[in-house]
A protein has these predicted regions:
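NAD(P)H-binding glycine-rich loop region in Rossmannoid oxidoreductase-like domains
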Residues: 66-104
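Conserved C-terminal active-site "lid" loop/helix of NAD(P)H-dependent oxidoreductases
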Residues: 229, 262, 284-307
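Mid/C-terminal beta-alpha module of Rossmann-like enzyme folds, strongest
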Residues: 242-285
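Amphipathic terminal alpha-helices
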Residues: 1-8, 36-37, 311-325
Length: 325
């Protein structure tokens, strides 16, 4: 990946570094052949970081920074780039802790932008979400599209605060001249999710790894764009280095647009299990994303030169499951 050479000699902060996307981004940086780059991997749980990154414990390029994004960042490092990938994407958290979700998404961006502004940061990459689009009208989502979000629903804590955080990036760009770019990943899958992660793909994989049939709590008719995490982080690199300041870019694999039901059947087939239906309880319903169709255009991202890596979704899901087992 020739683009990564542009980071030679740079210092980067990656928040959410023990999460799915953040940790894969750290891997990409540190596994690049002899790349002279300094990476500060920020997260709240040092033990989780030790488990996730054992191969870097003696690597002088790697530093773990214990940090909660809801607080101002207190350190003396001048980061060339900040990649803000910290956000709780668990539907269970949306249902039970909507206040914390909103404050973390908005204040996290503010705290990091304030730090970057005070320390001559070169560029800020905000990892937002495709949930900013809300409920659409059936069209493919381009970056200038915005659908309906019920602002009086507590479940809207996530898309509404992601929208607000994006606007905050734009405001800092306008008022303070800061260089910000935004990524909007589609539903992203890959290994290294936690036992408490209740996103659908993680639930389905845990089912088959335990030798269980996959339990669906809905009809599974919701239609989604998906992206393998390695493809997602390669897209983040293009956005970081080639994206236009102030712009947002969708991330998705356009060969991986399937329904939740089709996803369940794919994972069940890989694990030689069945899919069974079960009614959800009220708490589970409260965390559901009500959007029925969420398909992304990636034309803007591809114009930067990015392409999805070879392999279909089933082969990448097999790789995910084998790395989880």
């Amino acid at each position: 990946m020739a683009e990564i050479e542009k980071l030679r000699g740079k210092t980067l902060l990656v928040t959410g570094a023990t999460g799915l996307i953040g940790s894969a981004f750290v891997d990409m940086l540190l596994r690049a052949n002899d790349l002279d780059v300094t990476v500060y991997a920020a997260g709240r749980n040092e033990e989780r970081a030790r488990r996730r990154f054992p191969e870097y414990k003696d690597d002088e390029r790697f530093h773990f920074l214990k940090y909660d994004v809801t607080e101002p960042l207190d350190c003396d490092v001048c980061f060339d780039y900040i990649i803000h990938a910290a956000s709780n994407a668990s539907p269970n958290f949306f249902a039970n802790n909507p206040v914390e979700v909103m404050l973390a998404n908005i204040n996290g961006v503010k705290n990091l932008l304030d730090y970057g502004r005070a320390h001559d940061m070169q560029r800020f990459l905000y990892v937002s979400s495709g949930e900013v689009y809300g409920e659409g009208d059936g069209r493919v989502f381009t970056e200038d599209y915005y659908g309906y979000v019920d602002i009086n629903s507590p479940r809207s804590c996530y898309p509404s605060s992601k929208r607000a955080a994006e606007t905050l990036c734009a405001a800092y760009g306008k008022e303070y001249g800061m260089d910000c770019v935004i990524a909007r990943p589609s539903h992203t899958y890959g290994p290294y999710f936690t036992e408490s992660d209740n996103r659908v793909y993680a639930q389905f994989i845990r089912n088959i790894l335990r030798g269980e049939d996959i339990v669906m709590k809905s009809t599974g008719s919701q239609f989604r764009s998906w992206c393998y995490v390695d493809d997602c982080v390669s897209a983040l690199l293009y956005i970081l280095l080639e994206g236009k300041s102030g712009e947002a870019y969708n991330i998705a694999d356009n060969t991986s647009n399937i329904s939740i039901r089709e996803l369940a059947e794919m994972i069940a087939e890989i694990g030689n299990r069945k899919v069974i239906m079960q009614l959800p309880d009220d708490a589970e319903k409260a965390g559901y994303n009500v959007v029925t169709k969420s398909v992304f255009s990636t034309a803007k991202l591809e114009a930067l030169g990015w392409r999805v890596k070879e392999g279909d979704m089933k082969s990448k899901m097999k790789k995910t499951i084998s790395r989880c087992s």
